[in-house]
Amino acid sequence: IMQDFVHLHVHTQYSLLDGQASVARLVDKAMKNGMKGIAVTDHGNMFGIKEFTNYVNKKNSGPKGEIKDLKKRIAGIEAGTVECEDKEAEIAACKAKIVEAENKLFKPIIGCEMYVARRTMDLKEGKPDQSGYHLIVLAKNEKGYHNLIKLVSHAWTRGYYMRPRTDRSELERYHEGLIVLSLIHISEPTRPRLIS
């Protein structure tokens, strides 16, 4: 069982011609292997994210219910509406059970494998602009999630040329709350100026 390992680059059936696994099967397999989460990073899109988060929320409903009930019990003990012999011991036991339940939660990491234009996303002039490099972009918080949505949306609406593309200036503009990872064989070498 792999308890300390999390895949940060996973394609689902929403990565056409590359991924074939369903979201549910990926999550189930990761959980079966003892993983605490996975990052869904489909090529140039976030089409599977809603399905991913909904499925993980469904799988997490048991532990979340336990946590809610335990917190309610603690509040009742503190308010005096729940009877028990040793309040401090009971609260400590409830808090320990909360930690156990939290350790059962599966973490859905939202991301995208983005295509980055060699020059700018607005240039669409033949072969140099057809290719570029790839980056894995992960949201580490709500701000990052919103910035990732902006990057992917702009890649489709402004940068599309053979595929949805972003560029360095967009990454610099919307970097807050994001973690950016390079892919060895298809990435531009890491540069300090990529994201400040």
Can you say where each PLM-predicted feature lies in the sequence?
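Phosphodiester-processing cores and adjacent nucleic acid-binding clamps
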Residues: 1-187, 191
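Hydrophobic alpha-helical segments, chiefly the membrane-spanning helices
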Residues: 195-196
